[in-house]
Amino acid sequence: MDRRLLALAAGMFAVGTDSFVVAGILPQVANSLNVSVSVAGQMVTVYALSYALLSPLIAAFASHWPRKRLLLAGLAVFVAGNVITALAPTMGWVLFSRFIAGLGAAMYSPTATASGAALAPPEKRAQALAVVIAGLSSATALGSPLGSFIGSLGNWRDTLWFVSAVGLVAAVAVHLMLPAIAALPSASLRQRLAPLRDSRVALTLLTTLAAYAGMFSVYTYMGVSFDRATGGRAEVLAGLMLLW
């Protein structure tokens, strides 16, 4: 296995864990900050919107940056956002920090997939992309339950420290293992969005959006939905998330 791809996958694991782990600590966040669960759930909304909306913008406007520099900058912003969340005294600070973390994720993820493809010969690019994306997939299976379990041992802030640590480890791995990767040929935002004019592409993306929106709307509030079954025990919830 190419260690360079594993370094990129580690960063994707951190980004994915941050996307999903809030589901396991949402009731704790709401109780700690004296807000409703629905308000605390905006942590997921702000992170997801920041991540989704800024990704194509950054990919277009930062295309002239060397890839490795952009990867490290993205992980630095991502870690900073999670550290602020871990220290945040109010819900306002939490939401602000989630935006920052989403910005870092938006800087990192598209760059990581493009870099993974650039590191592999043409006949192995699909395999390289699969390795990088596996970091994101494994975050659902392992990162989120583990982060929730860590939160159950202390408080929800420990979970954010865990995510920050994973992001920091990924940054060190990228710094040590990745070679310098030249900036890829630039494409304007209009060029990047041009495929959406094809109704087949647009419909496929809308279907994917609807499916994931429905799935993660349920997943985000899993801690509340299963509160009676888990007896409010976060470690039991972490086990359910692992099974899911």
Q: What annotation goes with each model-predicted range?
A:
Residues F20, A48-P56, T140-A141:
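Residue-level signature of mid-helix packing/kink "hotspots" within the transmembrane helices
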Residues L53-G92:
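Conserved MFS/SLC helix-loop-helix module at the cytosolic interface between two early adjacent transmembrane helices
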Residues M91, S97-L136:
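Cytoplasmic helix-loop-helix junction between adjacent transmembrane helices
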